[in-house]
UniProtKB/Swiss-Prot annotation:
<feature type="signal peptide">
    <location>
        <begin position="1"/>
        <end position="23"/>
    </location>
</feature>
<dbReference type="Pfam" id="PF10807">
    <property type="entry name" value="DUF2541"/>
</dbReference>
<protein>
    <recommendedName>
        <fullName>UPF0412 protein YaaI</fullName>
    </recommendedName>
</protein>
<keyword id="KW-0732">Signal</keyword>
<dbReference type="InterPro" id="IPR020240">
    <property type="entry name" value="UPF0412_YaaI"/>
</dbReference>
<comment type="similarity">
    <text>Belongs to the UPF0412 family.</text>
</comment>
Length: 134
């Protein structure tokens, strides 16, 4: 009876350690300052090409309005993918996950992400934080 209890306790502890040891793969890819006037050439270049399966956008400071976004992959043909993003993000808000690499080609790595948009309702520049998940 004692050995059954010991075995059960050991399994429970190992399960807890197993689950707490797993780290999420969310990484802050970068932050972009959004100008007050509409701009279509805001780019976040990743210094190290990395596989990113989805991203989240957060308005860290100020409200912002987005009119487009695209992901560029390191490939022989400079492949890219347009992203379906919300048109407005309020300060402190985070979007749902936005999937990229939709063709299931997980070998492609992201070299840059571009945005079109601007700050709204503020005299200061809003900041857009990009979080990636691999």
């Amino acid at each position: 009876m004692k050995s059954v209890f010991t075995l059960s306790a050991s399994l429970a502890i190992s399960l807890l350690l197993c689950c707490t040891a797993q780290a999420n793969n969310h990484k802050i890819l970068g932050v972009i300052a959004m100008p007050r006037n509409e701009t279509n050439d805001l780019a976040l270049k990743l210094p190290v090409c990395r596989i990113v399966k989805r991203i989240q956008l957060t308005a860290d400071h100020g409200d912002l309005q987005l009119s487009g976004a695209a992901v560029y992959f390191k490939a022989a043909r400079s492949a890219s993918q347009s992203l379906n993003i919300p048109s407005e993000i309020k300060e402190g808000q985070t979007t749902d996950w936005i999937n990229i690499n939709s063709d299931n080609d997980n070998k492609r790595c992201v070299s840059k992400i571009t945005f079109s948009g601007h700050t709204v309702n503020s005299s200061d520049m809003a900041t857009l934080k990009i979080i990636g998940d691999d």
